[in-house]
């Protein structure tokens, strides 16, 4: 057993599918309840939390090790509170659909989470999104798999962002990253010469937080953060993560959770859908169940 924690960041309006994600997490991955789960949130009441825990107990037959922790997001110093700033002139319309809370999430997972007080005692963390579903047993402990292979990061490749979204973020993100590379070349072991919009699927990832707590990564994140463009241009944590790993991590430090050979669904995308078990599919809420069957048919 590794020193690890599983993390969600959710909100009250997403609870109708988040609870199903939790059920499938304990059913198929955290089966013996050995790893704690922290659910960060900013608006879930104590009554609703109690109801969720009762529902989980009824489903699992035991009370899982789940802690709900309220988090207060604040804008970094110097960031405008004018809503108009978050729909920049010329910004692609799809980017304007992401509310301020989404951009707080990008900042949190991009760099703040690693030194959050509730995370400091852990080495590894697994992030699971509210609309992430494990649809078959994960037979091997993912954290042990990380340690055995010397991985410092792993994701589950699944689906892609819109090319227009990537292109919009890429315009300024790569320029900012190049500025950091130019002034920190002696600290960067593997500086990228170009970036074509590659990213990681951070909706389901495992991080060795010892790596991400290192000063060089934290300085890189601070450089990105101070531009304000996590908020103004929706620079995502998946993009921040890819460039930081590319700069500072050894080439063989990244694993792919597809190696663990299980079915994972995020939103409307499913990986290894033929491995899903019927008793897990039955737990899926609509419309996610319909999305799964479309993936199974290859639609």
Give the residues covered by each predicted segment.
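Conserved catalytic core of nucleotide-sugar-dependent glycosyltransferases
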Residues: 86-106, 132-228, 234, 238, ...
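Short, acidic, metal-binding catalytic loop of nucleotide-sugar glycosyltransferases
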Residues: 23-34
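Short internal beta-strands
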Residues: 36-43
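Short, charged/polar "capping" segments at the starts of alpha-helices
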Residues: 15-16, 43-52, 163
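C-terminal catalytic/acceptor-binding lobe
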Residues: 200, 220-299
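Active-site-proximal specificity loops/subdomain of glycosyltransferases
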Residues: 56-121
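N-proximal low-complexity "stem/linker" segments adjacent to membrane-targeting elements
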Residues: 1-20
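Short beta-strand-to-loop acidic/aromatic patch adjacent to the donor-nucleotide binding site
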Residues: 120-135
């Amino acid at each position: 057993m590794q020193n690890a924690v599983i993390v969600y960041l959710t909100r009250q309006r997403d609870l109708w599918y988040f609870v199903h994600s939790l059920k499938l997490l304990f059913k198929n991955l955290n089966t013996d309840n050995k790893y704690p789960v922290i659910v960060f949130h900013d608006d879930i009441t104590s009554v609703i939390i109690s109801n969720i825990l009762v529902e989980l107990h009824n489903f699992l037959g035991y009370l899982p090790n789940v802690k709900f922790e309220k988090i207060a997001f604040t804008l970094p110093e110097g960031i405008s509170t004018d809503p108009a700033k978050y729909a920049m002139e010329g910004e692609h319309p799809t980017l304007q659909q992401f509310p301020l809370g989404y951009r707080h999430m990008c900042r949190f997972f991009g760099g703040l989470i690693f030194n959050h007080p509730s995370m400091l005692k852990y080495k590894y963390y697994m992030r699971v999104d509210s609309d992430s579903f494990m649809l078959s047993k994960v037979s091997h402990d993912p954290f042990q798999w990380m340690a055995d292979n010397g991985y410092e990061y792993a994701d589950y490749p699944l689906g892609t962002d819109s090319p227009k979204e990537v292109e919009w973020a890429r315009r300024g993100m790569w320029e900012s990253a190049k500025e950091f590379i130019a002034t920190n070349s002696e600290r960067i072991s593997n500086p990228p010469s170009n970036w074509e919009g590659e990213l990681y699927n951070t909706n389901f990832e495992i991080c060795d937080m010892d790596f991400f707590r290192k000063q060089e990564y934290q300085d890189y994140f601070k450089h990105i953060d101070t531009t304000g463009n996590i908020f103004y241009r929706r620079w995502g944590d998946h993009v921040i993560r890819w460039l930081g790993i590319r700069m500072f991590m050894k080439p063989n430090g990244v694993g792919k959770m597809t190696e663990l050979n299980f079915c994972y669904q995020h939103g409307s995308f499913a990986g290894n859908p033929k491995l899903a078990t019927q008793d897990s599919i039955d737990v899926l809420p609509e419309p996610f169940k319909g999305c799964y069957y479309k993936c199974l048919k290859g639609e």
